[in-house]
């Protein structure tokens, strides 16, 4: 029973590049939630749009890392719309962008561990 309630706490998400849905899911899976971005989409003047619909009572942190796990961007929110020109500068020379949602307990005094959900990996051109 604990396992199923833990899965429900994940919520659902969408990762959109230039109004094109790249990844949509509700189960964190680093092997399945992977998409290669076309060079034309990556070089355009559009947006990276990340939308997370939460389940449960947590504090949420959206995090972008490179392929080696180095944090490139982080914000306390469940959704973000970022200019691709800004993201291209952050990820210049990188091969992948990994997108995570960090779920922290709503009360710091709870001493519960944070959960990290892999929302998706974008393979960059």
Task: Give the label of every model feature segment.
Residues 1-4:
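Bacterial N-terminal signal peptides
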